[in-house]
Amino acid sequence: MNEFLNEAKAGAKAWLVKAGTSLAVILLVVIGARVYSSSKSAESVIDNPTEEAITFKLDGKDYTLEPKTSQVIKLSKGEHTLEYLGETTKFTKKAPKFLDTDYSIINPTKSLYVLYNEIYGENLTETEADEKSSTYDCEDDQGKPDKCPRKFLSDVFIQESVDYGLDEATPDNVDVAKSTRYTIKKKLFRGDDFSKYMGADSEDVILEPVEVK
C-alpha cells in the first residue's frame, strides 16, 4: 500500500512539474509578445507621400523629409506638438492595447491614407466577402449611411490597429480556420498606393487561403 501511495505521489509531483513548466512557457510567450508589441508600438512613422520636400517641427525638434520618403522615430504615449507651414497642431498618442498590433503615422501634410479590410476566405461569394469585410461607416452613392471595407484617414496623427503597415505587402495566402471559413487582415495604404492596389475597375479583392485548418 505504501509503495502504491509513493508512486501516486511521485506521479502527481511529476504532473505538477510538467504543468508548471507548460504554464511558464505560456507566460514567457505572452510576455515576449507583449514586449515585442510594446516595442513596435513605441515607434511612429513620419511620412511624406507628396512630390515636395517638407520641413516641420515635432515637439520642438526640426525635421526635413524628402519627397516620397518616411522616417521611423520613437514616440512616447501622451501629448505632442507638430508645427508645419505656420500651423501648430497638438495630438495625443494613446497607450497600445494588450497584444495589439498598434501602428501610428505622423502626417504633417494631412495626406490621404486608407485602412482596408483584406478578406481571405474559402468558398465565399463576392456578396458574402463584402458583407463580412464591410465594418467601417461610410455613405453610398446616394449619400445614405452604409458600411464599407475601407476607411479614409487624413489627420495629422493616425493611430490604428493593423496587420500590415505602409510598406508591408499583404500576402497572397494566409491560414484560415475551418470553423470560420475566412479571416480579415487590416492593411494601411497611402492614398496613391491604394488606388494602384485596387486597380481602376476593382471594388474589392478576395484572396485565396492556404492550409485551411
Give residue spans per PLM region.
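Short loop/turn and low-complexity linker motifs enriched in small/turn-promoting residues
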Residues: 2-22, 28-67, 74, 85, ...
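Extracellular Ig-like/FN3 beta-sandwich strand-entry sites
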Residues: 77-79
